[in-house]
Every structure is written in C-alpha cells, then in structure tokens.
C-alpha cells in the first residue's frame, strides 16, 4: 500500500489530468460555463488533522449538489428523523438528479431520496427559522463551522443565474407543495435552495467538511460535536448509495467511498475514521460528475486501500 503524502497526490493529479479533456463544464446554469475545463485539484485532511494537497486545490467554485448532505444533516438535527423521512424517501432513484418523473408515478409521491433535487428541496423546507433570513444565516453558519472557514459565503452571480434558469426546480417544488411535502412558502424555500447551491468553497473546505463527517460528526480539531453520530452515519449512507447521481452504484464498486458530487465540478468524499477528501475538476460527464475527479478518487482508493467494502 502507498503512503499518503503530497508526492503521491501530485502523481495522481498528473496521471489523471488527461481526463479533463473528456468532459464539458456545466452550461445550463450560465455562470458555471465560465469554469476552466482543465482545472484539477485535490485536498485531503486525515484523522490526525494533517493536510495534503495538489493541483488546483485553492480554486473557488460553487458547492451545488454537495450542499445536499449538509442540508440533510440540518434537517435531521432540526426535526425528528421519522418526520424527515415521512417527506422524503431513502432509496436510490436510478434517474437523473433533476428528474420529475417519479414524483408522479411513485405510490407515495414523495422524492426517492435527499440527494436528488426534489428531495433536497424538501429537506431545505425542513430547516428551522422564523424567517427566510434566519434560515439563511443558520445554514451559512453551519457550513462555516463544518469547514472551519468564516469567509464562506454565497456567490450572488451564480445565485441569480440559478434563480433565473430554475424553472424545472420550481415545477418540482410546486408539485411537492401540492402533495403536502413542502413546509412553508414555496418561493422562500426555492430562494434558500438556490442560495445553498451557490455557496462558494474550495477543495480544502470540502476536505474539512469530509473529515468532520468521517470523524462521526466530531470536530477533528477541538472535539466539538457538530452533529450526532447517528446523523453523520445517515448522511454518509446517503452519500454512498445516492451521492454520485445515477452513477452511484458504479462508483461504489470502483471506488467504494461515501461521496457527493456537484455540477460545479466538486466532489466531497468521507472515509469513515480515516480522512476527508475534496476534489475539483469542472469537466463533467453526462451524469453530472467530474470525469477526472472520479478517476482521481478511483486511483487514490486503490493505492491507499480506502474502499470500505
């Protein structure tokens, strides 16, 4: 087995850089098409709080769907978990992340899981707060605490772009509201959802969040309980079964690490008890996952024996 160090990470980045040519940056949200297609970076923070990085690890990008497990954690902390899962399911969908189809054909009508757009809109509606502003501040505060970065904020150019082009998400939200799964005002829920997807981070932030999840919800630096062990376990389970869109099964076989991707090009991975990983590569495959990022994680998992199965 190889030893984790920056030399290894630089080798892995170098050997997988060619895969950045095999994908395309997201363009359906206009602001995302400004990303540099050939960027590729990684950061790892291990259980001893050692940080290793290589490539474009400090490049800023928006979190997009990687926000979903974090907002799920908030929903589980704010509500009884049976209440959460009476509104959103626990099963992989096998459909694209923005599909509406199963909201109509499923017997329950509720979203299959919290890692697809419909499910994440539901969990966003379950965040406590007396008004939209309080919910937004609580959400940002939680992201900042998990990442140990008080400078994390919303990229308002991306937020406006998301809001302007978010008709499909609007359709989902109003359908879910009509079936009783959305709590509160639909437009307020959507506004918070678009803002959470527009939070700007880098690979170091993702690695820090990943290690705190890997450490069962306990801050690796100061021992603070950021979430319960049960919540961290539920979140990592969804990352494993549903975190890579409709390529989650293939990723589980080839990589075997709980992970969540986003169309901004990021992937956050959490190896229980061992490390948190943040990867950035904005060239995406047809399912919305970073082409080179997945390859980087596959090689890393094989070389460090990270597969949890």
UniProtKB/Swiss-Prot annotation:
Gene3D superfamilies tied to this protein: DD-peptidase/beta-lactamase superfamily (3.40.710.10)
Catalytic activity entry: L-glutamine + H2O = L-glutamate + NH4(+)
InterPro entries: Beta-lactam/transpept-like, Glutaminase
Gene Ontology BP term (one): glutamate biosynthetic process
Example GO molecular function: glutaminase activity
Keyword Hydrolase: yes
Protein keywords: Hydrolase
Pfam families noted in UniProt: Glutaminase
Similarity section: Belongs to the glutaminase family.
Subunit organization: Homotetramer.
Protein name: Glutaminase
Record organism: Clostridioides difficile (strain 630)
């Amino acid at each position: 087995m190889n030893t984790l160090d920056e030399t290894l990470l630089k080798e892995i980045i170098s050997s997988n850089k060619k895969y950045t040519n095999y994908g395309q940056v997201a363009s359906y949200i206009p602001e995302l098409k400004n990303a540099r297609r050939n960027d590729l970076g990684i950061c790892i923070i291990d259980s001893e709080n050692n940080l290793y990085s290589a490539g474009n690890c400090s490049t800023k990008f928006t979190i997009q769907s990687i926000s979903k497990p974090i907002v799920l954690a908030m929903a589980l902390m704010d509500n009884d978990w049976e209440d959460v899962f009476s509104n959103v399911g626990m099963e992989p969908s096998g459909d694209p992340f923005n599909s509406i189809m199963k909201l109509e054909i499923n017997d329950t009508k509720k979203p299959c899981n919290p890692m697809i757009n419909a499910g994440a809109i539901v969990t966003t509606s379950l965040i406590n707060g007396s008004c939209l502003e309080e919910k937004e501040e609580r959400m940002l505060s939680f992201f900042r605490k998990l990442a140990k970065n008080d400078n994390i904020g919303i990229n308002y150019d991306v937020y406006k772009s998301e809001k302007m082009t978010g008709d499909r998400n609007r359709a989902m939200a109003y359908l879910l509201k009509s079936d009783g799964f959305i709590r509160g005002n639909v437009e307020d829920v959507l506004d918070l959802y678009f803002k959470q997807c527009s939070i700007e981070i880098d690979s170091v932030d993702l690695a820090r969040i990943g290690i705190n999840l890997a450490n069962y919800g306990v801050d690796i630096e100061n021992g603070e309980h950021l979430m319960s062990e049960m919540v961290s376990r539920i979140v990592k389970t969804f990352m494993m079964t549903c975190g890579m869109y409709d390529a989650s099964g293939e990723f589980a076989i080839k990589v075997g690490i709980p992970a969540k991707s986003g169309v901004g090009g990021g992937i956050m991975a959490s190896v229980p008890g061992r490390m948190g990983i943040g990867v950035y590569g904005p060239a995406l495959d047809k399912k919305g996952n970073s082409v080179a990022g997945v390859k980087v994680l596959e090689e890393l998992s094989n070389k460090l024996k990270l597969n949890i199965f």
